[in-house]
Amino acid sequence: MAGTKEIRTKIKSVQNTRKITKAMEMVAASKMRKAQERMRNARPYAEKVRNIAAHLATANPEFKHPFMQEREVKRVGMIVVTTDKGLCGGLNTNVLRSVTNELKSLQGRGVDVQATAIGTKGMQFLGRIGAKVVSHVVHLGDTPHLEKLIGAIKVQLDAFTNGEVDAVYLAYTKFINTMKQEPMVEQLLPLAADKLSQTEEEKRAYSWDYIYEPDAQTVVEELLVRYVEALVYQAVAENMASEQSARMVAMKAASDNAKNVIGELQLVYNKTRQAAITKELSEIVSGAAAV
């Protein structure tokens, strides 16, 4: 059995680790609230752009945007959203497993894939598996800006417009709640027809008629680009909210485990110390009896 000094050293080490994980848990909780607020704030913009584009598309059905053209899928673009840092449980592992399954499925059908990495972990993963990475953006920080994302996203959007890829997929982690995050692989392009359909309530709300400059088609084309960019930004915002939630939960679990380990070590320490005292008393009694 280890000596009391060695056990005290272990207890001190675990206590120091618990202080670190507790601090990281508190920081993640603070960042999580901000990330969730940012995620909620991003949703109305994308929805407003979608409604305006849907109204214009309904009013001008003769306009056919390249983003809505369906082709036989021979080449695919994949935008992979991950975190820059670790210590967030199985968040990245789960989404990258979904990406791996999708890549295997596509490659099994003879489909070529080119990837865009958003986040360091995704960039490292795509490099390890030898994927063709055509653009990337890393080190977004705690506050993602659309300006940083546009360059990497535009590579895939232009590739689809020019016919270099026939579909674009978006992989990210969807925020469900603090305890649950779900890996997603969704088709980004071509836009499904239901994306630009309107409910009766939306039709009444957007029943206005304006004069557009330079013309309605140009406005629709620009709006659809903004809408797709907003969808990617929303995915990044959801991924960041998921990251901070997963990190908070992971650090809380680490802190709780450290507390349990400290309790177990303290019990071992007490037993060891008690055994040492009992042994000393026995030796004293034996010595006294011998005299």
Swiss-Prot record:
One GO cellular component this record assigns the protein to is: plasma membrane
Q: Is ATP-binding among this UniProt entry's keywords?
A: no
Which GO MF terms are attached to this record?
A: ATP binding; proton-transporting ATP synthase activity, rotational mechanism
| Topology with respect to the bilayer | Peripheral membrane protein
Domain of life from the UniProt record: Bacteria
Instruction: Please name the GO terms of the biological process aspect recorded for this protein, alphabetically.
Output: proton motive force-driven plasma membrane ATP synthesis
The UniProt entry lists the main location of this chain as membrane
Localization of this protein: Cell inner membrane
Give coiled-coil spans as residue ranges.
none
Keywords from UniProt, A to Z, are: ATP synthesis, Cell inner membrane, Cell membrane, CF(1), Hydrogen ion transport, Ion transport, Membrane, Transport
Record-linked Gene3D superfamilies: 3.40.1380.10, ATP synthase, gamma subunit, helix hairpin domain
What protein family does this chain belong to? Belongs to the ATPase gamma chain family.
Complex formation: F-type ATPases have 2 components, CF(1) - the catalytic core - and CF(0) - the membrane proton channel. CF(1) has five subunits: alpha(3), beta(3), gamma(1), delta(1), epsilon(1). CF(0) has three main subunits: a, b and c.
Q: Which PANTHER family does this chain map to?
A: ATP SYNTHASE GAMMA CHAIN, ATP SYNTHASE SUBUNIT GAMMA, MITOCHONDRIAL
Protein purpose: Produces ATP from ADP in the presence of a proton gradient across the membrane. The gamma chain is believed to be important in regulating ATPase activity and the flow of protons through the CF(0) complex.
Per its record, how is this protein called by name? ATP synthase gamma chain
Q: What is the lineage of its organism?
A: Bacteria, Pseudomonadati, Pseudomonadota, Betaproteobacteria, Burkholderiales
The gene behind this protein is: atpG
